[in-house]
Every structure is written in structure tokens, then in C-alpha cells.
Amino acid sequence: SEASDLIVSELSSDKSLCKAYKSDASKIEECENLVEKVITDFGNIDVLINNAGITKDNLLMRMTEEDFDSVIRINLNSVFNMTKACQRIFLKNRAGSIINMSSVVGVKGNAGQSNYAASKSGIIGFSKSIALELGSRNIRCNVIAPGFIKTEMTDKLSESVIESWNNNIPLKRPGETYDVANLCLFLAS
């Protein structure tokens, strides 16, 4: 896409290589193919950041099974798929860092977001188990559970919802994407 081409162009330099890949993280075969391509292009994978996510908010009474399943498939199953696809590389290297994006909604819940809350709390439980399973092999698994972060996804919210959320934040403003990016850098190092 144009957006990914622009990002690749901005990040590429004489000293660094940046490449964009298109895949569907909710499909295990595509995850395995993606990992193979990255290994071919870069030789190794040191860090995995699982950040695929969607919302399809609705009250339970109005939520369709299809909307529930698609949020679980994209938000939670993708974490399993990419982690499983990278596991062999991390085990071979006896090192690796897995960073999974959850949400404060996965900890606290939120009315009208039962599917999203289930997916994000599932990420927390999955990550705890993977940390215990792979930690002895020097493979770390951490979760970031941000509160309200200003993104394209939150830009769709009404002013009243944004104001209500901001009033419950000590800084009285949403977090920025660079706040989360800096935390990823710390956890990956």
C-alpha cells in the first residue's frame, strides 16, 4: 500500500534495511510464510511484536456470532499464530523477545466490548503461560495493556466518549503511539 511504501522509504537508509510485508496474522499458514520471508531477507528474528487488532463493538444483545468470532480470530488467534511461527527460531537462538499488545479493557472490561475484552484478556493469559513455558530458554514474553491511546481506531469515537475517557486519566489526555513504541523498545532490549 502507499502508506507502507511511505514508511519503508522514511525508515530506510544506507545503514538500515526496512521492508514491508502483507499477510493475514489470523491464518497460521500466512504467518509461517511471513516468518520464512523475513528469515530469507534478514537472516534472523530477535523480537516479535503482536499488534494486530480490530474492534466490532456492540452490546451483547446486538452482537453477532460473526462479529465476536472475527475479533477473537484477529486479536487473539493472531498472537498464537505468530508466536508459534516464531517459536522455532527463538528456541534455536536460545533467545527472543515476544511483546503482545493487550488493552486495559482486557483487565477491566467495558460495556459493549465483550468480544474485544475477551480477546485482550486472552492475550494476557496466553502471554503469562508462554513466559512460563519459554522463559527457561531465555525467551521473554511480555504484555503491554495500554489505556486510551490516540490512534486511527480511537479517532472514530464521539467527542463525548473521548471527553469521558480523558476525565478518568490522571494526565487528562490520551496516551500517544510513541509512548507505546518507547515501551516496546525497552521491552525488546
Name what the model sees in each region.
Residues 22-33, 65, 178-179:
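The beta1-alpha1 cofactor-binding region of Rossmann-like NAD(H)/NADP(H)-dependent oxidoreductases
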Residues 59-60, 67-72, 154, 165:
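Substrate-binding pocket helix/loop in short-chain dehydrogenase/reductase
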Residues 61, 108-114, 136-137, 172, ...:
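Active-site loop immediately N-terminal to the catalytic Tyr-X3-Lys motif
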Residues 88, 132-136:
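Alpha-helical segment proximal to the catalytic Tyr-Lys
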Residues 103:
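Residue(s) in the substrate-gating loop at a strand-loop-helix junction
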